[in-house]
Every structure is written in structure tokens, then in C-alpha cells.
């Protein structure tokens, strides 16, 4: 009996770990309040673990609601998923077409924007296809510029600063070519580190965001999407008030 229970526990843990590794597909969670006088803003996120770790859509939603916005979010994100994979995914394309999203946030795999050959051959054509699909349903595409790895890409001769410049250039160039808004989360990370290098924005792997990193990305998206500073919003995303205020301030100044 005990062995059977133990096997069941191990099986359940395995399933949970597998789900965490694969990622998430979640649509229309916590719908807009029908009682709110503020128009509903519906935002779909297409990304990978940079999006689903710490649940960026939920952090953004809570921040926006605390700022007086009536927001609903959805997400399709799998570990390591690229924009090219999203562009060929029935789940991603179905999510774009299946609900009345007003905005769709696109987040590319972290290394591709830093490598010129990968940017030209993979990121640009995939983003172009996705932007076309998004605009076909009268939604607005948004590019979420990511942050460099803490140690850059040593194998490609890029330290943190050089990788961030390359990522910035790729997203900004893509935004200009396709006429798409860019949310400069990566530039915000660099700005925060200039203000206080002791703030921990990465997890221990030096790649994925800490809770502070996710909150910062949410603040930058809030500032760009609503054309308003997040400074003073009461929702701190589980951070200290002082740290949240610092991140809000940097996001509001970009």
C-alpha cells in the first residue's frame, strides 16, 4: 500500500515538473469586470519561459488594475519557444484568431535577437508573419524587447553590455521596419543596474527574470501601453515598497 502511494506521489510530481518545463497556454484568465466604467483592455502574450516564469501576464494585469485600468490577459508560452514556432503553431494562431484581443505581445527567444544571422533568418520573417496575423483580426502587435543574459553570450564574444546593445538594435530595427511598438524591457534592466547594481533582476541561472525583473518588465509595458507613468501604483508585485518604487521610476522615465 505504501509503495503504491509513493509511486502515485512520484507520478504526480513528474507530471507537475513536466508541465512546468513545457510551459503554459492560458486564455481569458480573470476577465474584465463588467461593472467597471473603464473600457476593457484585452492583452494576449506569445512568448516562452521569459514570459511565463513569475507569470508576467498576471503581474502586468494586477499592476494595471491597481493603476485604474480594466485589463484581461491571456498567454501561450512554452519553454524555449521562438517566434518562428509561434508563427507555425495552431495554438498560437488559434489564440490570435479565437478571441477579441486588442493587443498581442510578442517575445522572442533570448539569444536570437543578439545574433545577426539568426535575427535575419528567423526573427524577422516570423515576426512579420505574426504581425500580419494579428493585424488581420484588427489587433495591435507589440514587441517585448528582452534583456541580455547576465554574462552575455561568451561563446559568441558578447558580454552583457554588448549582448544588450545587439538585442536593442534587433528589436528597434524590427519595430521600425514593421511599424510596431517596442516595449524596451531590456533597456530598463540596464537602466536599473546603473541606478543600483545590487538589485537582483536575474534568477541564479543569469537568464530568467527574478520577481523584480518580471515586475520591471510589467512596469515598462504599462508605461508604453497606457502612455502613463507607473510611479505611485500601489501594487508592488510582492516586492518591498522601496524596490517597487525604484523599478516604477525607471520604467516611467524611459
Residue ranges of model-derived segments:
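Membrane-interface motif at the C-terminal end of an N-terminal transmembrane signal
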Residues: 19-31
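Alpha-helical cap/lid subdomain in secreted, periplasmic
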Residues: 93-211, 223
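N-terminal Sec-pathway targeting helices
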Residues: 1-14
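N-terminal low-complexity, Pro/Thr/Ser-rich intrinsically disordered segments
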Residues: 29-42
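Short alpha-helical patches at coil-to-helix transitions and adjacent helical residues
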Residues: 53, 211-218
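Conserved SGNH/GDSL esterase-like catalytic core that processes O-acyl groups on lipids
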Residues: 41-44, 50-129
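Conserved catalytic region of serine esterases and O-acyltransferases that act on ester linkages
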Residues: 201, 208, 218-254
